[in-house]
Amino acid sequence: MELLPHEKQVVEYEKTIAEFKEKNKKNSLLSSSEIQKLERRLDKLKEKIYADLTPWERVQICRHPSRPRSVNYIEGMCEEFVELCGDRTFRDDPAVVGGLAKIQGQRFMLIGQEKGCDTSSRMHRNFGMLCPEGFRKALRLAKMAEKFGLSIVFLVDTPGAFPGLTAEERGQGWAIANNLFQLARLKTPIIVLVIGEGCSGGALGMAIGDVIAMLEHSYYSVISPEGCASILWKDPKKNSEAAAMLKMHGEDLKQFAIVDVVIKEPVGGAHHNPAAVYRDVRDFILREWLRLKDLSIEDLLEQRYQKFRTIGLYETSSESSPEA
């Protein structure tokens, strides 16, 4: 597993404990109580390190090569999954994986953005950067869900929509805008979960829903930290400062009413205990589905409209208001 800079001290401590345990099999260097004491110190060290992570360190966790991706969540949560492909206009976009899913006996239309896990699959998936056909594919499946009375689950994980010339020629901006328009008035419950990177219009094109959740170390932002640093300071190396300024993580976005729920991750990130994350995400989906399914279509659409209508509102106190 690839090591992040802030993980080195933890890994060295873990190796030391493992060496003591191995030597103890031949010579009793430490008692079991002393080993347990070292393990408790390790737990405290982990808690301290991961409680004091900077925004940039959390971005690194979010981008960890071993972090679970959409296909992993599908395998970990679903009893059944039937993939549906193509946009019925141009071609299939491998950066989107979607289809009919069964979770705890309940049927959903599950649509996820997929980056890939190694060099060949990342190239095949275009590193999770959607082309116009990817957005059209997602919308086609969403409308199919509406037609058959299925709730929709979107899994967001993208560094952004594909910025290439071919994507622009095929109407990238229009495809994203049309998704925003169509998803806002879709007559079925929509649950959105940001599981990794949620960057710019590439994320927003699949993030219109009745409830929006994020994993603890995922991020949701108008731009990547590197892109922000390049624009503001002409220096992509100032990504740490940009990550802090963008307020891109769950606790900040929840205060701004951009996201509704932040799902805790295991200590160190989702890649350290994927099974626990699959369970928590599954439970969240089922809990929100139970809440949304009994709403009338009128109430569902009105709440969705008001949710996005109020994003960006702010209040000023009368004391700070200029006198007439």
UniProtKB/Swiss-Prot annotation:
Keyword Nucleotide-binding included in the entry's annotation: yes
GO cellular component terms listed in the entry, alphabetical order: acetyl-CoA carboxylase complex
GO molecular function terms listed in the Swiss-Prot or TrEMBL record: acetyl-CoA carboxylase activity; ATP binding; carboxyl- or carbamoyltransferase activity
Domain CoA carboxyltransferase C-terminal: 37-291
Record EC number: 2.1.3.15
Keywords tagged on the record: ATP-binding, Cytoplasm, Fatty acid biosynthesis, Fatty acid metabolism, Lipid biosynthesis, Lipid metabolism, Nucleotide-binding, Transferase
GO BP terms in the entry: fatty acid biosynthetic process; malonyl-CoA biosynthetic process
Listed PROSITE patterns: COA_CT_CTER
Top-level division of the source organism's lineage: Bacteria
Compartment annotation: Cytoplasm
Enzyme class: transferase
Protein's UniProt keywords contain Nucleotide-binding: yes
Catalytic activity: N(6)-carboxybiotinyl-L-lysyl-[protein] + acetyl-CoA = N(6)-biotinyl-L-lysyl-[protein] + malonyl-CoA
Pathway in which the depicted protein is active: Lipid metabolism; malonyl-CoA biosynthesis; malonyl-CoA from acetyl-CoA: step 1/1
Main location: cytoplasm
Function: Component of the acetyl coenzyme A carboxylase (ACC) complex. First, biotin carboxylase catalyzes the carboxylation of biotin on its carrier protein (BCCP) and then the CO(2) group is transferred by the carboxyltransferase to acetyl-CoA to form malonyl-CoA.
Homology family: Belongs to the AccA family.
Assembly information from the UniProt record: Acetyl-CoA carboxylase is a heterohexamer composed of biotin carboxyl carrier protein (AccB), biotin carboxylase (AccC) and two subunits each of ACCase subunit alpha (AccA) and ACCase subunit beta (AccD).
Name under which the protein is recorded: Acetyl-coenzyme A carboxylase carboxyl transferase subunit alpha
